[in-house]
């Protein structure tokens, strides 16, 4: 009797535990009576039709639908799954839609995910706390995630940037060719996703067509256990909107752990797509009057909104700006050039502002530009700043990034410069995912920047002190020629005048020791250029706190290598083909320019001759006075002493554009 009672208790425990396990396979022919689904955000079920809606015609929405029970695989089971669903995407305006995804994730928490092209499961940083595999039906074109078109299907792993994608289509076995499908048509589309081993296949077809014999997408390198870091997963759908909107519907859904046991959807039981009928209905007279009244009210609102908007975005033009007319751009032209400062044109964030790519008309062709939006808290100093910007526009040298003009609007200044397609030099020095620049190219860039600095110091109408020379401020044009940019910290003064400024500005590691006492001069630019020479040759930043003390400071480390008669070992280890004599000469020149004593540094005219081989380096040694000695600016907690320092701990400062930092006195 006791034995029977124990067996009964064990059986009851087994039944209770089993009730908490996933129920697979499952099928929903519609969503009229739904169990085991969890909806959040804008997702809802339309009771009248039994249809699942992810988003509607409201901007910046996110909708999720999960099968509420996790799918679990025993250690003896292979991780595989098959799913089949019918969806419909309906435009809600022009432009319309961002599409939707079917996803597999290790959690139902998508905290930090963003709307628009990130589908409510990813974000613009390319990181998410939730590990996820997704199949996207994408109806927008976003260049920052490398979309191939505004009508494609992609496979995403932990990022909105697809590992493989293709334009939406299906293989017709009858016609023996691919036939295009328009995702954002409002017509029902069948989607099959099959995963087994490391292969993921995705197939599409119009409603009532058989599953194609050839998949649209096939990836053979997906390890779902590694992606999810476990054998437990949630499955579901996500959709999102931005300023572009669409209706995203799921009509039916089936899921199984294997293709063989995947249930079919009964197409006859599927709900109809809302708003899909094109049949025109007659309009009653009363309704016509009502619509006319609504139109009149809407028109009045639009007129008021237009007048308000025109006043809100009116430009600031003062009498003293008339002399700068030819280089002043209208706000309207820059707004159109950047597509309304759209995130799709966003290039990055530089000193004190965001930068956007723009396209401006120029005679019979288009000109690509970079437009930086800089905030300015007041009118104090604006006149002087604009005057200096205009003066710098007159600088003409092949190795300078041209400043084209400006626009002023309320408390905002917009600076327009030439667009540099290959970005900033620091990306190629410190981002090891990019191809390393060969030595001959690096040397050519060093000569370009030396020539530009020599021009600023000795050949321009006024002496120009750059004050922020570093790899992040060196841009690369289409031919990878070096161009010196970011004149936001620069100052001009007449020859023979006192060049001292009211505040020490620059980037820690590049700042000469005399900056705090004597102010900026051409000599402080030479010091920074010396550090830049070492930076480019060694492929390292001037100060790297994460390294051992012996290697932490670049100047000191290069000097120590020279003392050990192994100066060539200081070079970037990624350099393969190079002249040892050239590399050692550039390293010695870098130490000479970064001499602690200002009077011992060469002028930029001499530096150009040294680099071009027209002049031999003077004799000096690693133990010579001032050689390899660190500036106190690199050793002390400078930000507490000097109010206007900028730190460059990553290469995100400048990317594919010139970043004009704005500084007036000790303010921003």
Curated annotation (Swiss-Prot):
Catalytic activity: L-seryl-[protein] + ATP = O-phospho-L-seryl-[protein] + ADP + H(+); L-threonyl-[protein] + ATP = O-phospho-L-threonyl-[protein] + ADP + H(+)
Region annotation Legume-lectin like: where it falls in the sequence: 24-256
List of catalytic residues: 468
Record InterPro entries: ConA-like_dom_sf (IPR013320), Kinase-like_dom_sf (IPR011009), L-type_Lectin-RKs (IPR050528), Legume_lectin_dom (IPR001220), Prot_kinase_dom (IPR000719), Protein_kinase_ATP_BS (IPR017441), Ser-Thr/Tyr_kinase_cat_dom (IPR001245), Ser/Thr_kinase_AS (IPR008271)
TM spans (from-to): 286-306
Principal subcellular localisation of the protein: membrane
Extracellular compartment spans: 22-285
An annotated GO cellular component: plasma membrane
Disruption phenotype: Increased susceptibility to the oomycetes Phytophthora brassicae and Phytophthora capsici.
Entry keywords, A to Z: ATP-binding, Cell membrane, Glycoprotein, Kinase, Lectin, Membrane, Nucleotide-binding, Plant defense, Receptor, Serine/threonine-protein kinase, Signal, Transferase, Transmembrane, Transmembrane helix
Topology, Cytoplasmic side: 307-668
Signal peptide annotation: 1-21
Subcellular localization(s) per the UniProt record: Cell membrane
Positions glycosylated per UniProt: 56, 125, 167, 201, 223
Enzyme Commission designation: 2.7.11.1
A single GO molecular function term of this UniProt record: ATP binding
UniProt cross-references to PANTHER family, sorted A to Z: PTHR27007
Annotated family: In the C-terminal section; belongs to the protein kinase superfamily. Ser/Thr protein kinase family. In the N-terminal section; belongs to the leguminous lectin family.
Name of protein: L-type lectin-domain containing receptor kinase I.7
Organism this protein belongs to: Arabidopsis thaliana
Upper lineage: Eukaryota, Viridiplantae, Streptophyta, Embryophyta, Tracheophyta
